[in-house]
Amino acid sequence: MLLTPIRRWINWSPTVSEKPNLKIVTMNVKGSAIGGHEKINEYLQETNADIIFAQEYGRKFNIANYPYKTDQYEIVALKSKTEIIKQEKLATAGNGNAFYADIKFNGQIIRVVNVYLNPFSFDKQEVKPVEDFQENKAKVKDVVRKLVPTFKIHQEEIANIRKAIDSSPYPVIVAGDFNAVPNSYEYYELGRGLKDVFLEVGRGSSTSFHDYKFPIRIDYIFASKDIKPISYRVDRTVRLSDHFPVIAEFKID
C-alpha cells in the first residue's frame, strides 16, 4: 500500500503477452502552437490508434482514415476508426471541457470520455523559487490563492463527468488532461471504480507534462475493470507539445 503513491509516478509492471485489439492515444496538442498542425496530425496518424483523444486541439484536426469524429466541441476532440453511435457534451466550468462518445468496437459498445479539466493559470516565474525567503513566502500565498477557485471549478466538472461514467451501460475508458497530479482529489474521483492503466501495465516513468523544471504527470488513461489493459507508454520520442502523447493498448473480447 505504501508503494502505491510512488507507483503512480514510476512503475515496472510485468509485460503482458496477450495480443491487443484496441489502441488509443491521448495528447494535449497545445493548440498546435509548438509542433504545428501538419506534424501533429502526421504523428497521430502514424500511431495507427483506433481512437485518438485530443485536448487543446484547435480547428485543424484533419487526419485521414478516421471516418468518425467529434470536432464540434471546444478544446476537446476525438477521431475513431469505428462508428460513434452517440455523443454528448458534459457541462463544464471555466476553460475546461469534456464529452463522452459511445463507440462500436469488436461487436460491442464502449463509452469513451475525453477530459480536459480547467487549467491552473501560473506563469513559470510564479512558481520558481528565489533566494529571498519573504519573496518565496509571498509567492506561495499567491499560488494558494489562485488554486482555490480552480479546485472549486474542478469539483463541478468532475461531478458531471462522473455522471457519464456511473450511468454508462457499457465499459468505460476515460482519458485526457486532468490538470492534476496522481495524489489529488481529481485523480481519486475520476478514477473511482476504474483502473489506472499505468498502474496495471505501465513501465518506467508516467510523467507527461514537461514544460516546468521538473516533469509531472497530469495526463491519464483509466478503464473499467472488464477492459483488459495490455500496454501503456508515454512517448518521449516526440516534442510536438508541452505534453508527451500517452498510448495504451487493450484487449476487448
Q: Residues of each region from the PLM?
A:
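N-terminal signal-anchor transmembrane helix
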Residues: 1-38, 42, 46
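Structured beta-strand-rich core segments of catalytic domains in phosphoester-bond hydrolases
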Residues: 3-16, 36, 53-129, 233-237
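Active-site-proximal beta-strand elements of phosphoester/diester hydrolases
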Residues: 21-31, 109-118, 141, 175
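Active-site environment of divalent metal-dependent phosphoester hydrolases
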Residues: 31-35, 58-62, 95-97, 120, ...
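Proline-aspartate-enriched helix->loop->beta-strand connector
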Residues: 44-54
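A solvent-exposed, charged loop/short amphipathic helix patch at secondary-structure junctions
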Residues: 126-147
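Alpha-helix-centered segments that form part of catalytic cores
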Residues: 146-168
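Metal-dependent phosphoester-hydrolase catalytic domains
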Residues: 163-172, 178-253
